[in-house]
Swiss-Prot record:
Family: Belongs to the GPAT/DAPAT family.
Protein name: Glycerol-3-phosphate acyltransferase 2, mitochondrial
Protein source organism: Mus musculus (Mouse)
Biological process terms in GO annotation: CDP-diacylglycerol biosynthetic process; glycerol-3-phosphate metabolic process; phosphatidic acid biosynthetic process; piRNA processing; triglyceride biosynthetic process
Residue ranges annotated as Mitochondrial intermembrane topological domain: 333-449
Length: 801
């Protein structure tokens, strides 16, 4: 499946003439999804180039255009040709023989090297003030170090690794249709290995299966045993013991003790020594930058930032000269272990519970063609040392959301400050707090930078495109022939924006595959003309489709922000229900557009936008405006008396440079620019624009409507209360509104939590101590009904009903 889907006009009409086909569900598709001509002649974009601003040398050194044409491979497809043997018996035992032939480096003296680490030796000798070794017998401290080390890791067992690889390969072939990996991306990683720096893979986290699948993919490509930093909260003690023998790493609970606690100092020193030994020996390390799936809370993982901070500390201390960071993204048609109830934390997975879950999955997959496809993406590696040097020069001053947005919401000010927003929802761990404040900031911005790159380079799967169409355009149903045409259109729009898709095949077969995966959330009805009608199931099914459609949001995020900003600009001029021609009459100045875009950028959470720290808001506003012009929604309008935009002959040369650094706002109104805010735009009157504009606005509707309903919820007077209890009450309110209004895509606990945290940053809610713990209170500023209405009105201006 290494090319695009093929759009054949005859397939869109075949549903009217194929009387023998009784149901889409009963028709098989799996064996027909073959590599064919690229979709509409478009090439497949090569995703994942590293940041040219922060890492220009890495951007040039580890990439060559020839690797773009290497194509894809199915990692779990192991045949007789993948072994050194031939014959009918080999064809039946190829999985087992393949696992025996994999090279597994062994190191039995790792524990001894960790004990000989300088930091550990200082603890054993009592030379660290306040540590556990001060005033204690060295033997007692040594036993404590060995106990902590046993909690972190054990030496991987080669026999167990081979046995597990064979079992996992067998299981993955029954669970997935394929696991695709670009050969060119793998070649970049292999080239980075030859440079000698240890590899650190920084990945998104979509499923609990990621911790097994990604190490297997890297192991199968000859990168050796990848050590995986796992979350001890998701595993029982028995499962943790097994995973350590397979290369897993776990943080001891003592690392989160206070900075002056002796046990905490000892645990953090052992963790640093362990990571230093892994990096020095050249073992690859895999860190997940997102929180485990299903856990409510911030998107960026506190655990991932802690491990990344230890890696940065090792490089800065000179333990290793450099480390090579590789952003990783993984995409599923459907996440295999997606929890049905997202409102509660997942219980730790036990050894027998996991085995039972695997057995149930195998039973469900037996004789079933509804297997999902997986796409693993390895972005361009880059140097940590180079990023550290260049990134510090991009840092600028930032302000809280309360200072940036609250005066504008209340109507006390109309000017948006020219500073960036400071918003950090991920709580710091003990390992991160032990670093200097400057290094803590480096870890946070690097993790956000890498996660942004990983999400942007992730392939868009067919289920995300189908769910987006059904949710945003056809909640009341659509005939299959029309749905096929719009699926083809949205796929092309995705490719034109430089994003890749994780599927290929005949269009009709692909639709059968996608709808069969979504059969729990859609209904198929046959009409008398012979066509089929696809209808989304109301209720929780729409919430599930909304979660799937969020995978498509990064592709259209800039245009969606711009469309909602235009909607907010027109809200006070034209009635929302007014005709498109009436809205197209209004002139929109560039300064007004910039202001509205900035307001929306400040309102939306950074966990959703994932802006790159090296990019200023000014540059993002310009990018949004450019995207709106490129997609045809905005057209330039020449005001009377102004010089035409195409007339470059009469431009006067200035003695000063006509450019400025991306973070410099001091010269935004300079006279050196003839008409900085004089450019005006109008909405395009093309026939396709109204539908596309509405489509873009609806991409951000779930979170904006959740915020607006959270503002309405303030009227009910549910405060003071704890943050957890208040978030739960808000989620129940969103569910009640969903039942009344049919807006089920807003009934998501994560949206409720985002609304509460945004309102805290905005100064609407305040957290105060109490005997029972911290309590949320309504701030005095928003205690009046008038200011609450202003907040709700400010949010609703961006919503297109």
């Amino acid at each position: 499946m290494d090319t695009m889907l093929k759009s054949n006009p005859q397939t869109q009409q075949r549903s009217n003439h194929n009387g023998q086909e009784t149901s889409l569900w009963s028709s098989s598709f799996g064996m027909k999804m073959e590599a064919i001509t690229p979709f509409l002649g478009k090439y497949r974009p090569f995703m994942g180039r590293c940041c040219q601003t922060c890492t220009p040398k890495s951007w040039e050194s580890l990439f060559h255009r020839s690797i773009m044409d290497l194509g894809f491979c199915n990692v779990i497809l192991v045949k007789e040709e993948n072994t050194r043997f031939r014959g009918w018996l080999v064809r039946r035992l190829c999985y087992f023989l393949w696992s025996l032939e994999q090279h597994i480096p062994t190191s039995f003296d790792a524990s001894q090297k960790i004990m000989e680490n300088t930091g550990v030796q200082n603890l054993l000798s009592g030379r660290v003030p306040g540590a556990a070794g001060e005033g204690q017998a060295p033997e007692l401290v040594k036993k404590e170090v060995q106990r902590i080390l046993g909690h972190i890791q054990t030496t991987p067992r080669p026999f167990l690794l081979r046995l597990f690889s064979w079992a996992l390969l067998w299981f993955l072939n029954r669970l997935f249709l394929n696991v695709q990996l670009h050969k060119g991306q793998m070649k970049m990683v292999q080239k980075a290995v030859q440079e000698g720096s240890p590899l650190v893979f920084l990945s998104t986290h979509k499923s609990l299966l990621d911790g097994f699948l990604l190490p297997f993919v890297l192991f199968s490509q000859g990168l050796g045993v990848v050590r995986v930093a796992l979350d001890s909260r998701t595993c029982s003690p028995a499962l943790r013991a097994l995973l350590r023998k397979l290369g897993g790493l776990f943080l001891p609970p003592e690392v989160n003790l206070s900075l002056d606690n002796s046990e905490g100092i000892l645990a953090r020193a052992v963790v640093r020594a362990t990571v230093e030994e892994l990096l020095t020996s050249g073992q690859p390390l895999l860190i997940f930058l997102e929180e485990p799936p299903g856990s409510p809370g911030p998107r960026l993982s506190a655990l991932g930032q802690a491990w990344l901070g230890v890696v940065i500390q090792a490089v800065q201390a000179g333990i290793i000269s450099d480390a090579t960071l590789v952003p990783v993204a993984i995409a599923y048609d459907l996440v295999p272990d997606a929890p049905c109830n997202m409102n509660h934390d997942l219980a730790p997975l036990g050894l027998w519970t996991g085995a039972l879950a695997v057995f149930r999955r195998l039973c469900n997959c037996w004789g079933c063609n509804r297997r999902v496809c997986v796409r693993v993406h390895l972005a361009q590696p880059f140097s940590l040392q180079e990023y550290t040097i260049n990134a510090r020069s991009c840092w600028d001053s930032r302000q809280t959301l309360e200072h940036l947005l609250q005066p504008i919401v209340l109507g006390e000010c109309s000017v948006v400050p020219d500073t960036e927003k400071e918003q950090e929802w991920t709580p710091p761990t003990g390992l991160l707090l032990a670093l200097k404040e400057e290094d803590q900031l480096l870890v946070r911005r690097l993790s956000r930078h890498v996660l942004s790159a990983s999400v942007a380079s992730s392939a868009v799967m067919s289920t995300a495109i189908m769910a987006t169409l059904l949710l945003l355009k056809h909640q009341k149903g659509v005939v299959l022939s029309q749905l096929l045409g719009e699926f083809s259109w949205l796929t092309e729009e995705t490719l034109l924006r430089g994003f890749d898709v994780g599927f290929s095949g005949q269009l009709r077969c692909l639709a059968q595959h996608t709808l069969s995966l979504l059969r729990a959330h859609v209904v198929l009805l046959r009409v008398h003309q012979g066509d089929l009608v696809v209808v989304p199931r109301p209720g929780p099914g729409l919430t599930h489709l909304a979660r799937l459609s969020m995978e498509l949001l990064p592709t259209f995020l800039s245009e969606a922000v711009g469309a909602c900003a235009v909607r907010g600009l027109l809200a006070g001029r034209v009635p929302p229900e007014g005709p498109w021609e009436l809205q197209g009459i209004e002139l929109l100045s560039q300064n007004e557009l910039y202001r509205q875009i900035l307001l929306l950028l400040h309102l939306l959470p950074q966990d959703l936008l994932l802006p790159q720290p090296c990019q200023s808001s000014y540059c993002y506003c310009q990018e949004v405006l450019d995207r709106l012009i490129q997609c045809g929604l905005l057209v330039a309008e020449e005001t009377p008396g102004s010089r035409p935009a195409c007339d470059t002959g009469r431009q006067h040369l200035s003695a000063k440079l006509l450019w400025k650094p991306s973070g410099d706002f001091t010269d935004s109104e300079s006279d050196d620019f003839e008409e900085p805010g004089g450019r005006c735009f109008r909405l395009s009157q093309q026939s396709r624009c109204p539908d596309f504009f509405l489509f873009l606005c609806r991409l951000l509707s779930p979170i904006l409507k959740a915020f607006a309903q959270a503002a309405t919820f303030l009227h009910l007077g549910q405060l003071p209360d704890s943050e957890v209890a208040y978030s739960e009450k808000l989620f129940q309110f969103l569910q009640a509104c969903a039942q009344e209004e049919g807006i089920f895509e807003c009934a998501d606990p994560n949206l409720a939590i985002s609304a509460v945290w945004t309102f805290k940053d905005l100064g609407v809610l305040q957290e105060m101590p109490s005997p029972t713990g911290p309590q949320l209170h309504l701030s005095p500023t928003f205690a009046t009904r008038d200011n609450q209405d202003k907040l709700e009105q400010f949010i609703r201006q961006f919503i297109c009903s």
